[in-house]
């Protein structure tokens, strides 16, 4: 089951590192993290 942290659709880093976090958020976070 997907989850978001609190009411913010953008999970904080600690949540996005958690495989239980929302997959869309995790994908966006990883994409932003790979940018210079």
Swiss-Prot record:
Keyword entries, A-Z: Disulfide bond, Knottin, Secreted, Toxin
Tissue distribution of the protein: Expressed by the venom duct.
Gene Ontology CC entries for this record: extracellular region
Localization annotation: Secreted
Cysteines engaged in disulfide bonds, as pairs: 5-16, 11-21, 15-25
GO molecular function: toxin activity
Main subcellular location: secreted
Free-text domain note: The presence of a 'disulfide through disulfide knot' structurally defines this protein as a knottin. The cysteine framework is VI/VII (C-C-CC-C-C).
Name of this chain's protein: Augerpeptide hhe6.4
